[in-house]
């Protein structure tokens, strides 16, 4: 049927679907304390998945690989050989 140049159809084809359209929020990983920063015992230094940075002196590692300070002091990021990095916390009087 053709009325004034328009075609009328009995049905309209479906629009279909897509597999895209989702995204997850970022996990807020990374450094939470900088090199040379004074922190308290129990403070989170670095959030990570796996051991991207290894725990050094006075630093503990949580079940999710988060690094945290065991003592009050100053944060120090250091190289551990050619390819690895570690973070240590030195007591304030020892760091000066």
Curated annotation (Swiss-Prot):
NCBIfam families for the chain: L27
GO cellular component: cytosolic large ribosomal subunit
Domain of life: Bacteria
SUPFAM superfamilies: Ribosomal L27 protein-like
PROSITE patterns: RIBOSOMAL_L27 (PS00831)
Protein name listed in UniProt: Large ribosomal subunit protein bL27
Chain positions covered by the region annotation Disordered: 13-33
Record family assignment: Belongs to the bacterial ribosomal protein bL27 family.
Protein keywords: Ribonucleoprotein, Ribosomal protein
An MF annotation (GO) of this entry: structural constituent of ribosome
Classification via HAMAP family: Ribosomal_bL27 (MF_00539)
UniProt-listed Pfam families: Ribosomal_L27 (PF01016)
GO biological process, one term: translation
């Amino acid at each position: 049927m053709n009325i004034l140049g328009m075609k009328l159809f009995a049905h309209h084809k479906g629009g279909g679907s897509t597999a895209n359209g989702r995204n997850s929020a970022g996990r807020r990983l990374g450094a939470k304390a900088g090199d040379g920063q004074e922190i308290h015992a129990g403070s989170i230094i670095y959030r990570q998945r796996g051991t991207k940075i290894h725990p050094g002196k006075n630093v503990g590692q949580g079940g999710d690989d988060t690094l945290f300070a065991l003592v009050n002091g100053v944060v120090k990021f250091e190289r551990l050989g050619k390819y690895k990095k570690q973070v240590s916390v030195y007591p304030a009087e020892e760091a000066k």
